[in-house]
């Protein structure tokens, strides 16, 4: 108990009390705003009409298509395949930041399977979640639509949000579609949100028949993979799209029974808010994902299958910033997520890309590789689109309300409450330690206008979809 007080309590729980003591009025207002769920943030900065182009529907701007094998890493879209449309497997890793995987340069041996399979694919090093909240990531990935700039879960606030899902697009092309997770889809209204989204089959822990829960979040990821393999083998006549979502890497990071813990935390304190447990669970999930690749090869579908692995958001463990869990900041450990695309048909040698992208770009990228046109209302762009924006947008709406944008190597963060600005050059400062805002006011002003355009585009986007009787609240940063 004493150890728990000094490791868990002192490092995290008391930190929440300190926030409340330092900002009581803001915390009270934020809690009211979160409970009300009807307001949207806006900035009053002036911006050019052209700044809204980042958020326009994809139907207003078509991209050329060329062979991906001759494309530069800056990204161009492949032409549609002439053979059977590829099977598509999308695996979303719960609470996994790029930093903690073996795909990044962090040195953690957590995902040896993904590292090995990347030899027949491409890894995107600068891919982002829009917020550290799973429900909002689901909405963005599935519908290629920016989530509302607010506090609430998109699945609960907008269960019937208009939009065309990637599953619907592919089902119209003859794909058999499915969604499988070892969690309970009743959480935050996911079951209702996924209803009528183009999935032939939707399965959660209740259909997996895998015994007792391993934690309050659901059964083991192993159970999901068992069901994935059965599902993929059930209908070989049609191409399929299977979206899956793991759960064991969610707090409390419960390891599978009988799996010994490995010393994966390196020089970090073993009981560093569950960091070592987290890394071990990620290692076990990676092992289970290896069974998916084995099943694809066993079925002889290696050249006819596209596997996409990404994360829903990051997870923080107190380094390099004083932040824990997720959704509290928009530093790299919170919002930069892995993205590996395994496609032996196109990639015979490992490739890496520095293209900046985000969750809204995932669906357009997948259908692009499959040779299928995107839904015209999608806001994202294929990561192989030569005319795509070099920017990614993200926000946090918990203890603070912060907006952020990554543009090439620059990352800009604005605290809407107090006007604090942070500017980092990620090309030389990967851990965001040197705030260059005072040295580059011109860059800050330009990127702040980009954020102002985002808030306006987001307001227009959700104007008709807002809950009945909604009003919006303008937050003006000091000096705005």
Where are these regions (language model features)?
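N-terminal secretory/membrane-targeting segments
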Residues: 1-86, 118, 459-466, 474-480
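His/Cys-centered metal/cofactor-coordination and adjacent catalytic loops
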Residues: 72-79, 83-86, 97-176
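C-terminal cap/loop subdomain of S1 sulfatases and analogous C-terminal strand-loop tails that border
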Residues: 316-317, 361, 367-426
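Long, internal low-complexity/basic segments
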Residues: 438-480
């Amino acid at each position: 108990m004493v150890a728990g007080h000094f490791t868990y309590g002192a490092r995290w729980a008391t930190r929440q009390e300190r926030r409340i003591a330092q900002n009581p009025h803001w915390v009270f207002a934020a809690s009211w705003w979160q409970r009300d769920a009807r307001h949207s943030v806006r900035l009053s900065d002036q911006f050019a009409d052209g700044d809204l182009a980042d958020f326009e529907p994809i139907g207003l701007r078509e991209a050329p298509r060329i062979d991906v094998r001759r494309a530069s890493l800056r990204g161009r879209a492949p032409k549609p395949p002439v053979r059977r449309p590829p099977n598509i497997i999308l695996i979303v890793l719960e609470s996994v930041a790029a930093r903690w995987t073996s795909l990044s340069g962090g040195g953690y041996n957590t995902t040896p399977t993904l590292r090995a399979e990347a030899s027949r694919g491409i890894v995107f090093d600068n891919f982002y979640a829009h917020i550290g909240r799973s429900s909002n990531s689901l909405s963005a990935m599935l519908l290629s639509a920016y989530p509302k700039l607010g506090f609430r879960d998109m699945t609960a606030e907008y269960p019937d949000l208009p939009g065309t899902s990637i599953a619907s697009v592919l089902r119209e092309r003859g794909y058999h579609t499915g969604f499988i997770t070892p969690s309970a889809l009743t959480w935050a209204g996911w079951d209702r949100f996924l209803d009528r989204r183009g999935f032939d089959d939707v399965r959660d822990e209740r259909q997996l028949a895998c015994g007792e829960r391993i934690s309050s979040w659901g059964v083991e990821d192993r159970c999901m993979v068992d069901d994935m393999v059965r599902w993929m083998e059930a209908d070989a006549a049609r191409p399929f799209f299977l979206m899956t979502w793991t759960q064991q890497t969610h707090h409390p990071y419960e390891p599978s029974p009988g799996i010994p813990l490995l010393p994966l935390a390196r020089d970090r304190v073993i009981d560093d808010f569950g960091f070592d447990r987290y890394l071990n669970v990620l290692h076990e999930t990676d092992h289970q994902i290896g069974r998916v690749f084995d099943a694809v090869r066993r079925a002889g579908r290696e050249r006819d299958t596209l596997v996409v692995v990404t994360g829903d958001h990051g997870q923080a463990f107190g380094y390099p910033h004083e932040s824990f869990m997720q959704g509290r900041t928009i530093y790299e450990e919170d919002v930069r997520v892995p993205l590996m695309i395994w496609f032996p048909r196109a990639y015979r040698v490992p490739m890496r890309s520095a293209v900046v992208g985000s969750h809204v770009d995932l669906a357009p990228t997948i259908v692009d590789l499959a040779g299928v046109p995107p839904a015209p209302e999608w806001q994202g762009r294929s990561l192989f689109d030569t005319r795509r924006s070099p920017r990614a947008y993200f926000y946090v709406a918990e203890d603070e309300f912060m907006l952020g944008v990554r543009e090439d190597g620059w990352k800009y963060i604005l605290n809407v409450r107090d006007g604090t600005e942070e500017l980092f050059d990620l090309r030389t400062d990967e851990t965001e330690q040197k705030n260059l805002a005072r040295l580059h006011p011109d860059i800050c002003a330009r990127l702040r206008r980009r954020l102002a355009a985002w808030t306006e585009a987001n307001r227009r986007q959700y104007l008709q979809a807002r809950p009945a009787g909604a009003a919006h609240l303008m937050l003006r940063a000091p000096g705005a």
